[in-house]
């Protein structure tokens, strides 16, 4: 029996879209993450779509980002931005809230948040 992917465990495309949209809604509405919001364009439509496509594949679903843009090269794509531990923590604050609003299962929350943290931490490009 094949193990289900996180994408399948979450419920597929609709749930990944909700998670992405909620993440950005939190970023837009929480003044404590304004420096993170300021790293993004005024119109978040393209950012929302790219994160949705990335998360789809990253979670084990359709590789939408790769099909459209090629390999994600996350660190390279984030090099124009000063990503330090504060930016990582703001990103995680938004994602943590979105994941906690979405999921009831503690084991799945913990698994996802650990993976998100590891990825967000890898994005840091500023010496501290």
For each predicted feature, which ranges?
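Core of compact, soluble alpha-helical bundle domains
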Residues: 1-128
């Amino acid at each position: 029996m094949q193990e289900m992917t996180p994408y399948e465990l979450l419920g597929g495309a609709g749930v990944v879209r909700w998670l992405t949209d909620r993440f950005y809604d939190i970023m837009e509405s929480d003044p404590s993450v304004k420096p993170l919001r300021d790293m993004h364009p005024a119109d978040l439509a393209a950012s929302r779509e790219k994160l949705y496509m990335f998360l789809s594949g990253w979670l084990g679903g359709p590789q939408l980002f790769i099909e459209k843009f090629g390999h994600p090269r996350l660190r390279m794509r984030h090099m124009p931005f000063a990503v330090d531990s504060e930016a990582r923590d703001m990103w995680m604050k938004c994602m943590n809230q979105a994941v906690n609003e979405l999921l009831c299962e503690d084991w799945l929350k913990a698994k996802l948040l650990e993976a998100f943290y590891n990825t967000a931490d890898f994005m840091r490009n500023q010496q501290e």
